Amino acid sequence: DSQFDPSTPTPFSFAGTHPDIEQSAFVQDLIHLGNWTVSAGLRWDHYHLLLDQNAVDPRLSISRYFHSADLVLHFSYDRVFQTPSFENILLSSSTAATNLQTGTLQLPVRPSVGNYFEAGLTKAFFKNLRLSTNYFRRDVNNYADDNQVTNTTIGFPIAFQKAIIYGAEGKLDVPDWHRFSGFLSYSWSVGNAFYPVTGGLFLGAQGMIPTSGHFPDSQDQRNTVRGRVRYQVASRLWVAAGIQYDTGLPFQFQCDSRLTLQQCIQGEVQTYGQQVIDRINFNLGRIYPSFQVSASAGADVYKSEHLKMSLQIDGQNLTNVLDVIDFGGLFSGNAIGPPRSYFVRLAATF
C-alpha cells in the first residue's frame, strides 16, 4: 500500500535557480583594565535570497578575576542573526510545491533573530582541580527548524514564532594529578518552541498546525552526563575510560484518531522493529535514557628524533545500548547511534 496521501501526484519534478547573496562586516575590540576583561563588538549582516533583510548585532563579554579566591566571574550577551537553511528552499517556496496536496500552508521563511545570555564562574581548587559553571538563556524569534516532503528524505527549512531555551552546565576538570587526568560534566537544559508557524511548507494535514501553544524543542535533553579518566601507566603507555548518560530527546508521535495508541505502536513495530520501539516511551513522548561506557589505550611504539609512531585502541558503546538518538515525528527523521564498536589507529609524525 502507498504511504502517500491519495491526492499526491505520482510524478513531480522541479528545477529552479536564484542567487544567494549574503554579506557581513564586524568590528571588535579586547580591553584589559586591571582584573577586568571586556570584549565588545558590532556585526552587520545582509541576507538576500527570497527575502531581503539586514541586521545589526551587538555582542559583549565581561569577566572579572578575583586573585584572593582564584575565581573568575563572567557574563556575555550576543545578538544573533541566523539565515534560513538554503536546502530546497526554492522548492518549498514554489507554486509547484503547493500543488502537491490540497490544504497546503506555505509561508516565507525569514531569518532567525535571537538574544543569547550567559553567566558563570570558574574556580581553581588545590592547584589540580578546576570547576566551571554556567547558566544560559536563548530567546529566538522565527525559530528555525526543518520539515520533510511526505515520506521522503527531502527536507526544507521552516520556522516557528519563537523559542525559549535555558539551562545550566558544570564541569569538573583534573588536568594532571599523580598520573591521573580527567573530567566530569553535567548539563541541564529546557527548550520550548512556540506556535504558530511563521515560515515554511506544510503539506495537506500538516497545514492544520495549532496557532497557539508550545512543544519541546528537538534538542530538549534535560540531563546529560559525560566523564572520562586517563591514567599514565608508563612514559609511553596510557589507559582511559569514559561514561556517557543521556535522558533522551523528545519526539512528536502522530496516531490516527481511528486507532488506539497500542494499535498505532504496533504499526510502528512493523516499520522500525521491536528493538527500536522498546527504546521509545510513547506515554511521555521521549526516548528512554541511555548509558554508555567507552575505553581506550595508547602507546608510543617508536620514538626517535625524526619519527614518532603511536598506536591507539578504542572501544565505544561497550554496554552495547541500542542508542536511539531521534525518533520519527512530524518534524524529524530517525537517527540511531553505532552499536558496540572497536577501532585501531596507527599514527606517524615526522
Where are these regions (language model features)?
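Residues that define the transmembrane beta-barrel architecture of outer-membrane proteins
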Residues: 19-23, 54-56, 113-117, 162-166, ...
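Transmembrane beta-barrel strands of outer-membrane/channel proteins
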Residues: 40-46, 75-79, 88, 133-137, ...
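Signature of Gram-negative outer-membrane beta-barrel scaffolds
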Residues: 1-73, 83, 94
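Gram-negative outer-membrane beta-barrel transporters
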Residues: 32-37, 135-139, 158-255
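Residues on the lipid-exposed face of transmembrane beta-strands in outer-membrane beta-barrel proteins
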Residues: 25-31, 60-64, 119-123, 170-174, ...
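C-terminal beta-signal and adjacent terminal beta-strands/loops
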Residues: 236, 244-269, 273, 287-292, ...
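Repeated loop/turn-to-beta-strand initiation elements of outer-membrane beta-barrel proteins
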Residues: 35-38, 69-73, 127-131, 178-182, ...
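Membrane-embedded beta-barrel scaffold of Gram-negative outer-membrane proteins
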Residues: 65-66, 73, 88, 108-159, ...
